Protein backbone atom coordinates (compact mmCIF):
# COMPACT_ATOMS: atom_id res chain seq x y z
CA UNK A 1 0.00 0.00 0.00
CA UNK A 2 1.32 3.44 -0.94
CA UNK A 3 2.05 5.78 1.95
CA UNK A 4 -0.37 8.71 2.14
CA UNK A 5 1.12 12.08 1.29
CA UNK A 6 1.00 14.31 4.40
CA UNK A 7 -1.49 16.83 3.01
CA UNK A 8 -3.78 18.49 5.55
CA UNK A 9 -7.28 18.97 4.11
CA UNK A 10 -9.90 20.93 6.10
CA UNK A 11 -13.32 19.29 6.46
CA UNK A 12 -14.96 21.98 4.33
CA UNK A 13 -12.68 21.09 1.41
CA UNK A 14 -13.23 17.36 1.94
CA UNK A 15 -16.95 18.07 1.56
CA UNK A 16 -16.30 20.10 -1.60
CA UNK A 17 -14.13 17.31 -3.02
CA UNK A 18 -16.84 14.76 -2.26
CA UNK A 19 -19.49 16.91 -3.97
CA UNK A 20 -17.26 17.29 -7.05
CA UNK A 21 -16.32 13.58 -6.96
CA UNK A 22 -12.60 14.33 -6.57
CA UNK A 23 -10.50 11.66 -4.90
CA UNK A 24 -8.20 12.57 -2.04
CA UNK A 25 -5.45 10.52 -3.68
CA UNK A 26 -5.73 12.60 -6.87
CA UNK A 27 -5.46 15.90 -4.98
CA UNK A 28 -2.50 14.54 -3.01
CA UNK A 29 -0.87 13.52 -6.31
CA UNK A 30 -1.31 17.04 -7.71
CA UNK A 31 0.40 18.63 -4.70
CA UNK A 32 3.13 15.98 -4.37
CA UNK A 33 3.99 16.10 -8.08
CA UNK A 34 4.06 19.90 -8.12
CA UNK A 35 6.33 19.99 -5.06
CA UNK A 36 8.66 17.29 -6.44
CA UNK A 37 8.95 18.73 -9.95
CA UNK A 38 8.61 22.45 -9.21
CA UNK A 39 5.74 22.75 -11.71
CA UNK A 40 3.69 25.15 -9.63
CA UNK A 41 2.95 28.84 -9.40
CA UNK A 42 3.43 30.88 -6.22
CA UNK A 43 1.21 33.80 -5.28
CA UNK A 44 3.86 35.56 -3.21
CA UNK A 45 1.41 38.06 -1.69
CA UNK A 46 -0.75 35.26 -0.27
CA UNK A 47 1.92 32.58 0.18
CA UNK A 48 -0.23 30.11 -1.76
CA UNK A 49 1.04 27.61 -4.33
CA UNK A 50 -1.03 26.40 -7.29
CA UNK A 51 -0.62 23.20 -9.25
CA UNK A 52 -2.69 21.01 -11.51
CA UNK A 53 -2.92 17.50 -12.85
CA UNK A 54 -5.00 15.67 -15.43
CA UNK A 55 -6.86 12.48 -14.51
CA UNK A 56 -8.70 11.09 -17.52
CA UNK A 57 -11.03 13.83 -18.71
CA UNK A 58 -10.72 15.88 -15.50
CA UNK A 59 -8.11 18.53 -14.67
CA UNK A 60 -7.74 19.14 -10.93
CA UNK A 61 -6.30 22.39 -9.59
CA UNK A 62 -5.05 22.59 -6.01
CA UNK A 63 -4.03 25.60 -3.93
CA UNK A 64 -1.97 25.03 -0.78
CA UNK A 65 0.27 26.63 1.80
CA UNK A 66 3.49 25.19 3.12
CA UNK A 67 3.43 24.76 6.90
CA UNK A 68 5.80 23.19 9.42
CA UNK A 69 3.50 20.13 9.45
CA UNK A 70 3.51 19.88 5.64
CA UNK A 71 1.28 21.27 2.92
CA UNK A 72 -2.22 22.45 3.85
CA UNK A 73 -4.90 22.60 1.16
CA UNK A 74 -6.51 26.05 0.77
CA UNK A 75 -8.76 25.35 -2.21
CA UNK A 76 -9.43 22.77 -4.89
CA UNK A 77 -11.40 22.87 -8.10
CA UNK A 78 -11.69 20.97 -11.35
CA UNK A 79 -12.81 21.26 -14.95
CA UNK A 80 -13.48 18.95 -17.84
CA UNK A 81 -12.46 21.27 -20.66
CA UNK A 82 -9.81 20.26 -23.15
CA UNK A 83 -8.13 23.08 -25.05
CA UNK A 84 -6.86 22.05 -28.48
CA UNK A 85 -4.84 24.14 -30.88
CA UNK A 86 -6.59 24.83 -34.16
CA UNK A 87 -4.42 25.45 -37.18
List each model region and its residues:
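Ribonuclease/tRNase effector modules and their secretory precursors
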Residues: 1-87
